[in-house]
A protein has these predicted regions:
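RNase H-like, Mg2+-dependent phosphodiesterase core
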Residues: 1-135
Length: 135
């Protein structure tokens, strides 16, 4: 089963973009343990970002400051998530999203509160999005 984890960064920053990452661990699942990006060092995030790039399916979705102004920060976050999922080179069977809201029009999607602590795919997406934004 192709499970994609989705997380975003940038919700607290009204001036910047919202960055969402979608990661499918596939056969790489279980070879390394991912944690919420807020609980890892910049060096570990960089190392894990590179491992994800080399071993997993991934994509990034961006909602610009104009998107945030046009909609609101939550809708812009959902837009970034949908862009990330749509940009994946494979079609996932299940979408697991960090938080309490599922973007409209997403099939087979489930939100998981504290998902970045509980679900490896979401933790990997958290790492990927934060490193991408910070670098």
């Amino acid at each position: 089963m192709k499970i994609v984890g989705v997380d975003e960064v940038g919700l607290g920053c009204l001036a910047g973009p919202v960055i969402a990452a979608a990661v499918v661990l596939g056969n790489f699942k279980g070879t390394i343990t991912f944690k919420d990006s807020k609980k890892t060092s910049a060096n570990l995030r960089r190392e894990q970002f590179e491992l994800i790039k080399k071993n997993c399916y991934f994509s990034i979705g961006i909602a610009t400051p104009k998107d945030v102004d046009k909609y609101n920060v939550l809708e812009a976050s959902h837009l970034a998530m949908k862009r990330a999922i749509k940009s994946l080179s494979i079609t996932p069977n299940k979408i697991l999203i960090d938080g309490s809201h599922v973007p409209k029009d997403l099939e087979n999607a489930e939100s998981i509160i504290k998902g970045d602590d509980l679900v490896q795919e979401i933790s990997a997406a958290s790492i990927f999005a934060k490193h991408y934004r910070d670098n």
